[in-house]
């Protein structure tokens, strides 16, 4: 197995990812049905060659002290986007990356 820190590069923090994490934090009382999830979800930037089982093993070994169990892993490959640098004079592309949305079992969380 690869080093877990080579597989999981970093936690992916965006407004959408934080909303997804926040859905599992509330109790859901007095809210519409389906507005909260039972299983916490977190988003990570992972290595481009990482597979779903490898991502699950890496997260379970990194957070072994919290004894988390991964329920499922969904991956998305983000393609490079065109970009302009230096006041629009130079054209280039942003780097492509792979992100993983990881669902933990109920009662398990890394937060």
Curated annotation (Swiss-Prot):
Alphabetical GO biological process terms: translation
Gene3D superfamilies: 3.30.70.330
GO molecular function annotations of the record: rRNA binding; structural constituent of ribosome
Family to which the UniProt record says this protein belongs: Belongs to the universal ribosomal protein uL23 family.
Keywords linked to the UniProt accession: Ribonucleoprotein, Ribosomal protein, RNA-binding, rRNA-binding
Assembly with partners or alone: Part of the 50S ribosomal subunit. Contacts protein L29, and trigger factor when it is bound to the ribosome.
InterPro entries, sorted: Nucleotide-bd_a/b_plait_sf, Ribosomal_uL23-like, Ribosomal_uL23/eL15/eS24_sf
Extent of the signal sequence: none
Native species: Chlamydia felis (strain Fe/C-56)
Gene Ontology cellular component annotations, sorted alphabetically: ribonucleoprotein complex; ribosome
Pfam families: Ribosomal_L23 (PF00276)
Name this protein carries in UniProt: Large ribosomal subunit protein uL23
Function recorded in the entry: One of the early assembly proteins it binds 23S rRNA. One of the proteins that surrounds the polypeptide exit tunnel on the outside of the ribosome. Forms the main docking site for trigger factor binding to the ribosome.
């Amino acid at each position: 197995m690869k080093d877990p820190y080579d597989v999981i590069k970093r936690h992916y923090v965006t407004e959408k990812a934080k909303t997804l994490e926040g859905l599992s934090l509330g109790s859901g009382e007095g809210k519409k049905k389906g507005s909260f999830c039972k299983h916490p979800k977190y988003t990570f930037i992972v290595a481009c060659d990482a597979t779903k089982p490898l991502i699950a093993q890496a997260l379970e070994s990194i957070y072994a002290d919290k004894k988390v169990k991964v329920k499922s892993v969904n991956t998305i490959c983000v393609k490079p986007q065109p970009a302009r640098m230096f006041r629009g004079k130079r054209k280039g592309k942003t780097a492509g990356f792979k992100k993983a949305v990881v669902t933990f079992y109920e009662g398990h969380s890394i937060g």
